Regions:
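A short coil-to-beta-strand element that immediately follows conserved catalytic motifs
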Residues: 54-63, 195-203
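NUDIX/MutT-family hydrolases
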Residues: 87-124, 295
Length: 302
């Protein structure tokens, strides 16, 4: 199976559509994964190579599958904001057009691209994003003689944390939050260090802080989601599935389950609420979860 990734690259009410002379078609930017590359990293790289723009990833749109001469091909598409850059013709793409949102489907050549664009247009382009991470591996509790709050990452856990340090910046987070346990903080400390920021401790998002006042914890999570830019939140396996499933239920978003492996992340996209929203308002006025995509690992798949 051929793995590939691409994006709906957008700015100011328009999306980028590229012309590929090899196929003489108009397409969304996409391409095959390089060896040792994750799907999100491939999406960002392919956008840069084909369009010249630095992409900041947003929500996962869909996975499409089709047959090519070399066999089945699977492409994951993300929404992506064009943060900076300029187009220059290159070996793969000889023309780029910025097309109004509503007109892009008329230009692309493939029906699969039209389906991806339909998904993109179903929600506002400018959504709020939270990357909800389960802490990396920290060995077995029974093998740690000290306070469990201080149980450190294992060697495998540090490798997972290094993968997250490379992966999570693709969404350009501006803040890093964590449950207070050492293994949660250390899982995302590298991301915070690269931002030159401190990890913001969130006691309500630990297992011992969440369940005694679940509603207050969910409200705190939504407050984080409503911040400027994307946020990273590191928490625990006893909390994350309930956060995701509860917010999905509130948003009317169907899910096929809420897996939560150590070192994994949920990419959550929220429709922004009206300014001045309050928890005293009806929950229909809160940030609304409109997309949830599970990233089972930050490490490249062999």
């Amino acid at each position: 199976m051929i793995r590939a990734a691409g994006a709906v690259l957008w700015r100011e009410g328009s999306v980028a559509v590229v012309h590929r002379p090899r196929y003489d078609d108009w397409s969304l930017p996409k391409g095959k994964l390089d060896p040792g590359e994750t799907v999100p990293a491939a999406a960002v790289r392919e956008v840069r190579e084909e369009t010249g723009f630095r992409a900041v990833l947003g929500r996962h749109l869909r996975r499409v599958s089709y047959e090519v001469a070399a066999g089945p091909k699977v492409v994951d598409y993300f929404s992506a904001w064009a943060a900076s850059g300029a187009f220059s013709p290159n070996d793969e793409v000889d023309e780029l057009r910025w097309v109004p949102f509503a007109e892009a489907s008329d230009l692309v050549s493939r029906d699969t691209d039209r389906v991806v664009l339909e998904d993109f247009l179903a929600e506002p382009a400018d959504l709020a994003h939270v990357l909800l991470v389960r802490h990396a591996k920290a060995g077995k509790r029974d093998n740690w003689p000290g306070d469990d709050d201080l149980r450190p990452l294992s060697a495998a856990g540090w490798r997972q944390a290094a993968g997250l340090r490379s992966l999570l910046p693709l969404w350009a987070p501006s803040r890093v939050h964590s449950a207070p346990r050492v293994r949660c903080v250390d899982t995302v400390r590298g991301v915070a260090d690269d931002l030159g920021a401190a990890v913001l401790l969130e006691p309500r998002l630990s297992e011992e802080g969440y369940w005694p006042d679940r509603e207050a914890a969910l409200v705190r999570f939504l407050e984080i989601a409503d911040g400027t830019g994307a946020s990273v939140v590191s928490s625990q396996g006893g909390v994350i599935p309930d956060i995701v499933s509860t917010l999905a239920d509130l948003g009317g978003l169907p899910l096929d389950g809420t897996p939560c492996k150590k070192g994994s992340a949920w990419l959550l996209a929220f429709r922004r609420p009206a300014p001045g929203w309050s928890t005293s308002d009806s929950s229909t006025g809160w940030p609304r979860l409109v997309a949830a995509h599970y990233l089972p690992t930050a490490l490249p798949t062999p």
